Swiss-Prot record:
Keywords tagged on the record: NADP, Oxidoreductase
InterPro entries: NAD(P)-bd_dom_sf, SDR_fam, TR
Family indicated by similarity: Belongs to the short-chain dehydrogenases/reductases (SDR) family. SDR65C subfamily.
Name of the featured protein: Tropinone reductase homolog At2g30670
Keyword Cell division: no
Source organism of this protein record: Arabidopsis thaliana
EC number: 1.1.1.-
């Protein structure tokens, strides 16, 4: 196989990798040959996933971690450094929480929790991973953002704020750390069929409205996001950095179009 299309010999850390988009990302990267460390807040889901990946022959290990905790993030990165001998090729900041409600109904605790989980964790883990990514001489950071960080969506102003910040962080790190052989990109999905998005899909009118605004006429699947993440980590994508790429079925480019009934 052309080495540009392989992750053989590379290492990765995926946060929130035991379910949803994170789970799909782990499978994608492992399938391309990467050794992966996964963290997740759910011990049950993590153990189930690790068992599943072992049966598939994937090189995946992991531990429980609440990435909203500063000390747990530090412990996580110490573990990863020991696991991979001080080198890391790929960091996927995937963890995120959503708490949609009108802006005037949010309280300080809502803001603090969302910021620490969605934004501060990604920022801090990127800081902690820098020496490992630099040591690998081929580092890549992927931020899992959202179309809610690109256009206005009914997913809550705090959520949108954190995702927009991740998009800007990818641009900044792409420029600041390029000299260290580190690329940074942001992947912004539309609503994807995952457990986290399930409450939205339970509202039939909401789903119908979303689909009507999406040119491809449907929500996405986790593996439609993970495929892009994997590509951005490959040597084949070595000249792509600082980008926010929407995986959204065309939602963010859709203007007004009128299609009369036949």
């Amino acid at each position: 196989m052309d080495k540009r299309w392989s992750l053989q010999g590379m290492t990765a850390l995926v946060t929130g990798g035991a379910s949803g988009i994170g789970h799909a990302i782990v499978e994608e990267l492992a399938g391309l040959g990467a050794r992966i460390y996964v963290c997740d807040i759910s011990e049950t889901l993590l153990n189930q996933s690790l068992s599943e990946w072992e049966k598939k022959g994937f090189q995946v290990s992991g531990s429980i971690c609440d990435v909203s905790s500063h000390s747990e993030r530090e412990t996580l990165m110490q573990t990863v450094s020991k696991m991979f001998d001080g080198k890391l090729n790929i960091l996927v900041n995937n963890v995120g929480v959503v708490n949609p409600k009108p802006t005037i109904e949010y309280v300080a605790a809502d803001f603090s929790f969302s910021i620490s989980t969605n934004l501060e964790s990604a920022y801090h883990l990127s800081q902690l991973s820098h020496p490992l990514l630099k040591a690998s001489e081929f580092g890549s950071i992927i931020f899992i953002s959202s179309v809610g960080g690109v256009v206005s969506m009914e997913c809550g102003s705090i959520y949108s704020l954190t995702k927009g910040a991740l998009n800007q962080l990818a641009k900044t790190l792409a420029c600041e750390w390029a000299r260290d052989g580190i690329r940074a990109n942001s992947v912004a999905p539309n609503f994807i069929y995952t457990a986290m998005a399930q409450p939205f899909f339970k509202d039939a009118d909401y789903e119908k409205s979303l689909v009507s605004r999406t040119p491809l006429g449907r929500a996405g699947e986790p593996n439609e996001v993970s495929s892009l993440v994997a590509f951005l980590c490959l040597p084949a994508a070595s000249y792509i950095t600082g980008q926010t790429i929407c995986v959204d079925g065309g939602l963010t480019v859709n203007g007004f179009s009128y299609k009369p009934q036949a």
